[in-house]
């Protein structure tokens, strides 16, 4: 019997450098101007600025391969110290608020041209789903 792996992401991250501007909602302090990967649901912002998990930020980014810019808000969901070999340096994981359908479609279609970003960590086992699968067998 195989163990089921946990997939916490709703969409595939793509390895692409993205021009952006990310600022705090309060005071409009610049947090970063470059992202290392992008998906329809979020980005990994290259930044050494101190932020809090759960903090709301304002994000503007250029859709790769276009001249179109997308404006949204995002929540800080992860901070990366940049100590792993696979890290590009300090970074901040952002989860976008849902994008309007036109922006979502544009981002999804343009990102298909870029390779996926593979996780640096091993995937976690979803024990609850594995137990449920065993119970059904």
PLM regions with names:
Residues 33, 71-81:
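Short beta-strand-centered aromatic/proline hotspots
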Residues 59-62, 83:
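Short catalytic/binding micro-motifs of nucleotide second-messenger systems
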């Amino acid at each position: 019997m195989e163990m089921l792996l946990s997939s916490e992401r709703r969409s595939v991250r793509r390895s692409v450098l993205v021009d952006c501007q990310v600022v705090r909602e309060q005071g409009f302090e610049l947090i970063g101007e470059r992202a290392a990967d992008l998906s329809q649901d979020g980005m990994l912002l290259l930044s050494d600025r101190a932020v809090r998990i759960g903090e709301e930020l304002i994000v503007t980014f250029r859709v790769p391969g276009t001249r179109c810019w997308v404006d949204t808000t995002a929540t800080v969901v992860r901070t990366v110290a940049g100590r792993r070999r696979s890290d590009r340096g300090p970074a901040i994981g952002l989860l976008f608020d849902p994008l309007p359908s036109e922006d979502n479609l544009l981002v999804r279609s343009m990102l298909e041209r870029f390779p996926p970003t593979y996780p640096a960590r091993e995937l976690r086992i979803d024990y609850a789903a594995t137990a449920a699968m065993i119970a059904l067998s």
